[in-house]
Amino acid sequence: MLLEYLQAALRHAHYEILKDDGTYYGEIPECRGVYANAATLEACREELREVLEEWVLFRVHQNLTLPVIDSIELTIKEVA
């Protein structure tokens, strides 16, 4: 389920080439604060994936909600 969520989120990524320095900028609008900047598109995609993974883990650790993406809802259940 986690892998499916990450893949779905990455499909929502938007990329652009920054005019001032020609680097690539990528973000996932549904995941506030998840963005990356790199010299190549592939490096930007890889960095964005890493940032997304860290963002999800941080939110889970802090018991914060995650946005539903493509009908995928990650919820953490408390175990006794």
Where do the protein language model's features map onto the residues?
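A short, exposed loop/beta-hairpin motif centered on an aromatic-Gly-Thr core
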Residues: R32-E42
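Structural detector for hydrophobic anchor residues on beta-strands
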Residues: R11, Y24, V34-A36
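Short aromatic-glycine-(Arg/Gly/Cys) micro-motifs in beta-strand/loop hairpins
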Residues: E16-P29
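Gly/Ser/Thr-rich helix-start
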Residues: E27, V34, L64
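Short, charged, surface-exposed hinge/linker loops at domain edges
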Residues: M1-H14, D21, E46-A80
